[in-house]
Structures are given as structure tokens and as C-alpha cells.
Amino acid sequence: MIRVRWARLGAWFFAAATLISVGRPSLAVDWPTRPVRFIVTLGAASGVDIGARLFADRLSAQWKQPIVVENRPGGDGILAITSFLSAHDDHTVLVTPVAAFTAHPYFHDPVPYDAEKLTPIARISNTVVAVAVPTSLNVNSLKDLEALARAQPGKLNWTTATGFTDFVFAGYLHTVGLKMEKVPYKNPAGAVTDLASGTIQVYMPAYAIVRPQVQAGAVKVLAVTNHERFSGLPNIPTAVEAGYPSLEFDGLVGIFASPEMNAETRAKIAQDVRSVANDPAILERMTATGQIVSPGEGAEFEASIEKQKAPIAEVAKLFGNKPVQ
């Protein structure tokens, strides 16, 4: 009897010691200890903002701390990024499309922040990016669009958001050998209005921006640039499927840390983001905003960013733009 009790007691101590060694408290376990800030590079009600708020709501419940979402749109994402880095705070993270900063070296000399200080924590989603045309243009595919552009060189107008997507579409035109005229817009609402009326013929934005006009029948999506089809547009091909690989890119969106955040905390956040991403309710809401839920932790997210940088560098060289050293 005594032997059994000592055996049981010994087993209990062994189990307790094992739990202590495995679950030893770390900075990651103790984080967060106060409210967290999400700084978002885009404005309220954008797809990225909606996604940030959905994740913030679920993470706040897990972490038992409030999460404040701050929108800092403008300046090609630079306003939000510089504000984030100047906080020097391990309870502040940046939520942004990767495109917000990967093209900065080609447009800003000097770049007003150190990109090496942006550490990828977790990918949240891929924003669906659409190649959209007015329905009145009477084209039903990218092949049709190419044929029309060849028949009317320089007569068709196009636009995208400034920066990353500029390079992608310009690279596509160069690769295919088409001539279209770019029309710059400061406000996406103006571009959508002009697209629906036929004033411009091609617009390549986040699908969420043109979705109301697509549903109204005034705008048509010819393809999505993402590497996989979007469940919200099951009959629309990817650019690669349509025969135009130069248009392929994913609208990567993720969470970034500043140098003040340690690796253990970053790993905790990434793990918690993945658990939220697996929630069917989150998947449904994100799909409704034109986003593909695509969780990826630190190293995987960083690899996807690097993969996206390479083709943009090649396109930049075509137009004489060189990265700022």
C-alpha cells in the first residue's frame, strides 16, 4: 500500500515537473499585459480594415485585453508605417497589405523608414485583386481585351492604385506588347465611377472596391490576379489560367512587429492568428469582403513576401527604376 502511494506520488511529481519544464512562463505567455494597438495602413471600411477588426475582436477575447484599431491611411502607407515604428512599443503591431511597402524603394528617395525593422508575424489573408472592365466594353476575357487593345493601340485607358499594382499592370503591358494610356486617380471612388461609365476601360483594384458595380451589372471582372480562384467568383479564372502569368500576384495582408517585440511574443501572436483564421465564421465574413483567408506564420509569411518582391524588381528595371540603396 505504501509502495503504491509512493509510486503514485512519484508519478505525480514527475508529471508536475514535466509540465513545469514544458510550460515554463515566458514573455510570450505573459503577453499582452495591457491594451494592444493595431495600426492599419488603409481607411475604415476597407477590406483590410474589416479583416483587422474581425481578427482584433477574436484575439481580444483570447488575450483578455482590449485591442484598439487605428486607421492611418494616406501617403502610400508611409504615414501608418512611420507612426508604427516611432511608437517603439511591443504592444503595437502593423496590419497592412505587403504591397504598401514593397514598391516604396522604387517611388520614394529616400524611403523615410527602415524596412528591415518590419518583422513579419503572421499572414492573415490574400486580398482578391480583380482585372475589371465596363460591361459596355463588350469583352469577356483577357484574350478579348488584348485583341481590342491591339486593334486600337493607345486608345484604351487603364488605372490601378499607385505603387505595387502600377508595376504589375505596366509589366503585363510590356510583356504582352500592348499600348494603353494610364489615367491616375487619387480616389478609388472616382475610378470606379469612371469605369462603370466607360470613361476608363481597365481598372485593377481590390475586388471589394468594384463589387457593388459588378453586382449592379455595370462592371465585369475578367480575371483575378491571385494564384487561386476566389470562391466568391467561382467562374472567374486566375490570370495564369487565362494565359497571362505576368499579371499574377497575391494581395498579401499580414501583421508586422517592430524590433521591440521578442520572438516568443511573435510566435504566440502567429499561433493565435491561425486559430482565429480556422473559425468558419471568420472565413465567411472575410470572403464577403473579397479576401481569401490564408494564415501563414513568420517564416512562411516572410518567404511569400520575398517571392513577391522579385518580379517587381524585374519590372522596375524595365522602366529604369532602381531600388534605393
What label would you give each PLM region?
Residues L27-K117, K155, F164-T165, G177-V202, ...:
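N-terminal (or domain-start) structured segment
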Residues G10-S21:
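Bacterial N-terminal signal peptides
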Residues D114, V210-N278, K307-A310, V324-Q325:
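C-terminal lobe and pocket-closing loops
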Residues M1-W6:
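N-terminal secretory signal peptides that target proteins for export/translocation
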Residues A99-D109, D166, A170-T175, V202-I236, ...:
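A ligand-binding cleft/hinge motif common to bilobed small-molecule-binding domains
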Residues T33-P35, T175-L178, A263-Q325:
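An extracytoplasmic/periplasmic, membrane-proximal ligand-sensing/linker region
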Residues G23-P25:
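N-terminal signal peptide c-region/cleavage motif recognized by signal peptidases
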Residues S86-H91, Y106-G190, A239-E241, L252-R285:
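Hinge/capping helix and adjacent helix->loop/strand transition within the periplasmic-binding protein
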